[in-house]
Curated annotation (Swiss-Prot):
This is Galactokinase. It comes from Aeromonas hydrophila subsp. hydrophila (strain ATCC 7966 / DSM 30187 / BCRC 13018 / CCUG 14551 / JCM 1027 / KCTC 2358 / NCIMB 9240 / NCTC 8049). The keyword NAD does not apply. It is an enzyme of class 2 (transferase). InterPro entries: Galactokinase, Galactokinase_bac, Galactokinase_CS, GalKase_N, GHMP_kinase_C_dom, GHMP_kinase_C_sf, GHMP_kinase_N_dom, GHMP_knse_ATP-bd_CS. Substrate binds at E34, H35, T36, D37, Y223. Its main location: cytoplasm. The lineage of its organism: Bacteria, Pseudomonadati, Pseudomonadota, Gammaproteobacteria, Aeromonadales. Catalyzes the transfer of the gamma-phosphate of ATP to D-galactose to form alpha-D-galactose-1-phosphate (Gal-1-P). It comes from the Bacteria. Keywords: ATP-binding, Carbohydrate metabolism, Cytoplasm, Galactose metabolism, Kinase, Magnesium, Metal-binding, Nucleotide-binding, Transferase. The record marks R28 as: Transition state stabilizer.
Length: 382
């Protein structure tokens, strides 16, 4: 059952009426540009065809009644006329409450809704299931109540909910691509200006995401450490963010900078440059150049930023050996596990998945999950 079918069925069963409308918001995979977003840099994600769906029913009061179809129909009920606080014990509720709270604070006129939520974005895999949920809820209120809110504002509102209400640091990339993606395109995003450029994906290119199923135990604490190291490096160079440096300036001014902070900065500055080059290579269908840039990005994440783990590096090796030079593969997401993303010719997908299924468990004692994706449209009404 798809998420849209599921929310429709659960809505009819639980509220004893049909929903007034449905909305969706996709997950995403970042093709290149890792840990660059909070450094005011560049990223190149695409939305994927895994998504969060919301079935919506209008109410004539100020209550928001939410049912989480994926959590045994757990419920949350809160009143728009009362201060919106945290839920006592349902973490999923806080993503929704945060989105609604900040929509209110931005001055949008809200009223009560019945909502049923379901999604198939793999959780904990670095494919932005949380951003997909935040954007889907923002989209639900926009479509149901006719709010004059832009897709960029829905994204910023979702990011604020995650940073300030849920308490997880994140850049703007995940919400922005979920809100504003376009089918068969990647999105080059300038995380400082929020300017975007749609990059057409070659029609003969498959997007393969492979989840290592490595438990990402360190990711939150290490993410915050990397962020602090990047900020320390920016202070050393006297710039607002690492976005403002190129490799020559980085090298010229490194005297007195802690060696670890220098290597962290070298990855970020390099990945900004690689991301801009990758957008051009993708637009030109130059899979050889794209593969080189993805390989360089992965090596920098492994050696300079130190966010990969042996199983991830092994997955990249297994896949790269099958892809050859026509396409690329790298870890994607925050690090310490999660997924790798590969861009390759469609006729190689089956061979790559077979190699992963045979070699990865033998080397690392883990089974990987593979998802063949298509670059998909951003959030909207179904």
């Amino acid at each position: 059952m798809t998420p849209s079918q599921r929310v429709s069925a659960v809505f009819a069963e639980q509220f004893e009426q049909q929903p007034d409308l449905l909305v969706r918001a996709p997950g995403r995979v970042n093709l290149i540009g890792e840990h660059t977003d909070y450094n005011d840099g560049f990223v190149l994600p695409c939305a994927i065809d895994y998504e969060t769906c919301v079935a919506i029913g209008l109410r004539d009061d100020s209550l928001v009644h939410v049912i989480a179809a994926d959590y045994g129909n757990q419920r949350d009920l809160f009143d728009l006329d009362q201060p919106i606080g945290h839920h006592a014990d349902q973490r999923w509720s806080d993503y929704i409450r945060g989105v609604v709270k900040y929509l209110q604070e931005r001055g949008y006129p809200l009223r009560g809704l019945n909502l049923v939520v379901s999604g198939n974005v793999p959780q904990g895999a670095g494919l932005s299931s949380s951003a997909s949920l935040e954007v889907a809820i923002g989209q639900a209120f926009k479509e149901a109540l006719g709010l004059a809110i832009t897709q960029a504002e829905i994204a910023l509102n979702g990011q604020q909910a995650e940073n300030q209400f849920v308490g997880c640091n994140c850049g703007i990339m995940d919400q922005m691509i979920s809100a504003s993606g376009k089918q068969d395109h990647a999105l080059l995003l300038d995380c400082r200006s929020l300017e975007t450029r749609l990059i057409p994906m070659p029609t003969d290119l498959a997007v393969l995401i492979v989840n290592s199923n490595v438990r990402r135990g360190l990711v939150d604490s290490e993410y915050n450490t990397r962020r602090q190291q990047c900020e320390a490096a920016a202070r050393h160079y006297g710039v607002k963010a690492l976005r403002d440096l190129d490799l020559a300036a980085l090298e010229a001014g490194k005297a007195g900078l802690d060696e670890v902070c220098y290597r962290r900065a070298r990855h970020v500055v390099g990945d900004n440059s690689r991301t801009l080059a990758a957008a051009d290579a993708l637009a030109q269908g130059d899979l050889v150049r794209l593969g080189e840039l993805m390989a360089d990005s992965h090596a920098a994440m492994r050696d300079d930023f130190e966010i990969t783990v042996p199983a991830i590096d092994g997955l990249v090796e297994i896949i790269k050996a099958r892809i050859g030079t026509e396409g690329g593969v790298r870890m994607t997401g925050g690090g310490f596990g999660g997924c790798v993303v590969a861009l390759l010719h469609p006729d190689k997908v089956a061979e790559v998945i077979a190699a992963v299924d045979a070699e990865y468990p033998a080397r690392f004692g883990l089974k990987a999950d593979s998802y063949v994706c298509r670059a998909s449209a951003g959030a909207g009404k179904l």
